[in-house]
């Protein structure tokens, strides 16, 4: 396993990789760092909504009826999270883009941010083409497949979870300089090949009602997870 600060639940990652597909990793070759000074961050791909889910819900063991009940429960939890973030006037999409740009700039790159929207069909995959920019050495392409909260089981607390994929592409010849997945929200050890960040035990919510009880806390918890994930991405270039 690659060196990471903390490790994650094998069950969680197995489900995630099965759902999203594994991403071949490519570490950053620091020998090219002398030639990569200016990075343009393209618009970040994000889900339509912040989400909340239970990885192993109790109802899943009761066939189709149980699965239907759990799907309705998950939809309700997601609505609660969305409502809490709206009450806190918090936009996770803007926050994610800002945190990534700020984190990568802290490791020595000059950052430009491409304005405009990411194509809808490429919201959850890497861009098929990049702009031609003479004053840029590489493009940082990031998309998130999950942003929100997750509980391992029905009886356990929710904690923030992020799943994002990142690729650094040479502006000169479109060579892939770096590629990997970053997953925040891990709780136990695993041998899964991904850059994993352990969840902060202090950022927990006993149930979905807790999201609404303190919307500011909900937003701050998600922001903390976003900042930690962005910094872990930036560290890959150090």
Predicted regions and their residues:
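Short, solvent-exposed, polar/charged sequence segments at loop or secondary-structure edges
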Residues: 85-147, 208
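Solvent-exposed loop/turn segments at secondary-structure junctions
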Residues: 47-48, 118-119, 145-149, 183-189
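Bacterial N-terminal signal peptides that target proteins for export
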Residues: 1-11
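Short secondary-structure boundary motifs at beta->alpha junctions and helix caps
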Residues: 80-89, 171-230
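Surface-exposed short loop/turn segments
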Residues: 23-26, 120-175
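A structural "domain/chain start" motif
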Residues: 20-109, 231-238
